[in-house]
Swiss-Prot record:
Keywords: Amidation, Cleavage on pair of basic residues, Neuropeptide, Secreted, Signal. Residues 80-118 are annotated as: Disordered. GO terms for cellular component: extracellular region. This is Leucokinins. The modification Glycine amide is found at G180, G193, G217.
Amino acid sequence: MAMLLQVALPLLAAVSWGWELNENDDSLAKIIEGCEWTSRQNVISEILLDRYRKYAMYNFFLLDDVCAVHEWNKNLKEPEFSENNEAEDKSPTSAQNTQEHIPGNNFPPPAASNPPVNSSCAKSAKDFFICLSNQLGDPTLNAMLLDNLEVACDPRFSPVSAIQKRNSKYVSKQKFYSWGGKRNNPNVFYPWGGKRNTGRVHRQPKVVIRNPFHAWGGKRNQKDDNVF
């Protein structure tokens, strides 16, 4: 199965490259003809390799449980250390399992580092990802897969999270507008997003100072007939 994959996939990539080369004959032909023979081989290899990576990534994302690979990779980056794990690490059996496999050593290699059998490569997305990593060893392909997994499976990149960020239930009312002006009613909303129905209890009553002049300029007369 592995030999069939290694032979069939490059052939498919070469056939697709040939079809696209006929369609885009002018652009690719100018690039290839302007190079020397060794450089020409490198250009063709880069084009085939890029299309093979896209083909492998397309088939990988056809699987149903691709987000399980994202969770598995995230747990590998952020291991959880607990008292039970520390106790297991101190035990002689765990020390024996974590020992590196050296030729001539009596201890078998760890089971987690063993690549899955070819028959199990298509059982799950995790096994398929491990098969691609072990058989191809292409760090660029692995980075492409992990980056696209983060965009597809991480809730921070989902459109639902963008809608929630704009909801007043999740975001408190800002005191300033985006253009820099200050809002007139900064206390209309609670910090958790709810709207205030009444004013604050501790707010002092508004004191109105009477203007001694009318709007038209004349002086006001008080009840005791004192003229200002």
